[in-house]
């Protein structure tokens, strides 16, 4: 129990005193024992070869010195992974994202492609070169993915006016018949039964044909007459100018306008007097009378 504190005291005293005599032998023995224990601990630790560390100075210098060293290391690591070896370089974890000098094995090209996701053959995704035989994959032929075919709407049939079944065809009049009918119409627009029968027989026409022609000709003459009357009315009607071009005067005529203008100019004799303005009588004509150059008939 007394030797441990003595040893501690001896070490404390050994640092403060020069080595010598019997007191200096105890510190030297303790130092030798500590050195031996440190050497044993270092021997117990596994020695790591510098070449195994990927980021060590020796590994970096070796990569610069030997260009083919990196390729050989990559080939060796790929061979170890292919053989199922579990040996991995230090400092690189199996699930780490940044693995130096050990790129992940390339996946097949079609792993994330449409064919890989839909589990379809690659031939079905390639467009056929010949447009004559278009090939469609099963999922495109499914009604779920492909739209329904567009319906071709037939153009609506043109509806024509239906004529009567017992309608007689239009009579083609000759030029001589038309001239004779026009001459007879100018002489007399209405024919009696006897005149119509005689005139139709002279033209080799039926009485009904002559009757219908005279009816149509009277309707045409009426339309022409109405159009002519409308033209005459438009020509005889005077063109009234708009209100902006008409001269507008108040009640009293131009003389009242001149008097009002003179009163407004010369009525203000004093500095505080306001110009006198003409005031129209209340209750009488409040609208101005417009004098126009045109006279209505």
Curated annotation (Swiss-Prot):
Location in the cell: Nucleus
Q: Which PANTHER family match?
A: HOMEOBOX PROTEIN MSX, HOMEOBOX PROTEIN MSX-1
Q: What is the lineage of its organism?
A: Eukaryota, Metazoa, Chordata, Craniata, Vertebrata
Question: Which Gene3D superfamilies has this protein been placed in?
Answer: Homeodomain-like
Q: What GO molecular functions are on record for this protein?
A: DNA-binding transcription factor activity, RNA polymerase II-specific; RNA polymerase II transcription regulatory region sequence-specific DNA binding; transcription cis-regulatory region binding
Q: What is the name listed in the Swiss-Prot or TrEMBL entry for this protein? A: Homeobox protein MSX-1
Q: Quick one: a GO biological-process term for this protein?
A: negative regulation of odontoblast differentiation
**Source gene?**
MSX1
Sorted alphabetically, which keywords does the UniProt record give? Developmental protein, DNA-binding, Homeobox, Isopeptide bond, Nucleus, Repressor, Transcription, Transcription regulation, Ubl conjugation
């Amino acid at each position: 129990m007394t030797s441990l504190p003595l040893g501690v005291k001896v070490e404390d005293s050994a640092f403060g005193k020069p080595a010598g005599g019997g007191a200096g032998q105890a510190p030297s023995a303790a130092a030798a024992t500590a050195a031996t224990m440190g050497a044993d601990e270092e021997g117990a630790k596994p020695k790591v070869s510098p070449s195994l560390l990927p980021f060590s100075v020796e590994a970096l210098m070796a990569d610069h010195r030997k260009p083919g060293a990196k390729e050989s290391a990559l080939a060796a690591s790929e061979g170890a992974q292919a053989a199922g070896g579990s040996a991995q370089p230090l400092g690189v974890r199996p699930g780490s994202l940044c693995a130096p000098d050990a790129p992940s094995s390339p996946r097949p090209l079609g792993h994330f492609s449409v064919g890989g996701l839909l589990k379809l053959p690659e031939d079905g995704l390639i467009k056929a070169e010949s447009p004559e035989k278009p090939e469609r994959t099963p999922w495109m032929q499914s009604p779920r993915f492909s739209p329904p075919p567009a319906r071709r709407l037939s153009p609506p049939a043109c509806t024509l006016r239906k004529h009567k079944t017992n309608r007689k065809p239009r009579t083609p009049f000759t030029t001589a018949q038309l001239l004779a009918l026009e001459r007879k119409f100018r002489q007399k627009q209405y024919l009696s039964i006897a005149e119509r029968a005689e005139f139709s027989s002279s033209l080799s026409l039926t009485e009904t044909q002559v009757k219908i022609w005279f009816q149509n000709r009277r309707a045409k003459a009426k339309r022409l007459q109405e159009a002519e009357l409308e033209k005459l009315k438009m020509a005889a009607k005077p063109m009234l100018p708009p209100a902006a071009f008409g001269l507008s005067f108040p009640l009293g005529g131009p003389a009242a306008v001149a008097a009002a203008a003179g009163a407004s100019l010369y009525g203000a004799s004093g500095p505080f007097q306001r110009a006198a303005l003409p005031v129209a009588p209340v209750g009488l004509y409040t609208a101005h009378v417009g004098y126009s150059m045109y006279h209505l008939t």
